[in-house]
Design a protein with these regions (language model features):
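Extracytoplasmic electrostatic interaction patches
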Residues: 70-202
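Hydrophobic membrane-insertion alpha-helices, especially the h-region
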Residues: 4-22
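N-terminal export/targeting and maturation segments
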Residues: 18-110
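A sequence-composition feature that detects small, non-aromatic residues
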Residues: 4, 9, 43, 135, ...
Length: 202
């Protein structure tokens, strides 16, 4: 009887271990980036291996606010782009990773695009804002009607927005990721992730 119970317990332990291992495996390319960065960001951040990517100099940090929110910027950008940042929030209530970049459309007008990945929901949300610079300050317009109005004013279509996203997120960030990590996924095959695009039906 004891042997039978022991065998059942062992089988149950193996099944639970396999289930735990399976649920913890990255389900998409953004999961990979999130999980691998979470493992390494306080010691030797894996993103340091990307050529031209600069980890924010305060890292690693024990500060309460900064401790779980690492970020970094690309030093070299394609022509016409002003900033490309990768950031995370490893707080349990957040569990997100983000890729944001700005593209100049006029001297004081920029397009700001955000890609926010929720590790909890496996959801990727793509959004766009308009940045207006005045002196040393920059304000962002988020209201959809106003954003669309600015885009129309400068002749920027949803096809253009998709092109900017592809050039930066797919052809740069995700390609760089695949060059430093043996990914199961690719820029053309994200894996199991729900993508929500703000401008999809504009």
């Amino acid at each position: 009887m004891k042997k039978t119970l022991g065998l059942v317990a062992l089988i149950l332990l193996i099944v639970l271990s396999c289930f735990y291992f399976f649920t913890k495996q990255p389900k998409n390319i953004f999961d990979e980036i999130y999980q691998e960065t979470e493992k390494t960001y306080q010691t030797n951040n894996i993103l340091r291996n990307i050529d031209g990517f600069d980890i924010k100099p305060v890292w690693p940090s024990d500060g309460e606010f900064l401790r779980y929110t690492p970020s970094g910027n690309y030093k070299n950008l394609p022509e016409g782009y002003l900033e490309l940042r990768i950031g995370f929030s490893f707080y349990s209530e957040d569990e997100i990773g983000s890729i944001s970049f700005e593209k100049s459309i006029e001297s004081n007008v920029n397009i700001k695009m955000w890609t926010i990945y929720s590790h909890k929901d496996r959801t990727l949300k793509k959004s766009v804002k308009i940045g207006l610079k005045k002196a040393d300050t920059e304000t962002y317009i988020e209201d959809e009607a106003q954003v669309k109005s600015y885009l129309e004013q400068y002749g920027i279509t949803t096809k253009d927005l998709n092109s900017y996203y592809d050039e930066i997120v797919n052809q740069k960030v995700l390609k760089d990721w695949c060059s430093i990590y043996d990914s199961k996924y690719s820029p053309s095959n994200y894996g199991d992730v729900k993508v929500e695009t703000q401008w999809e039906n504009w």
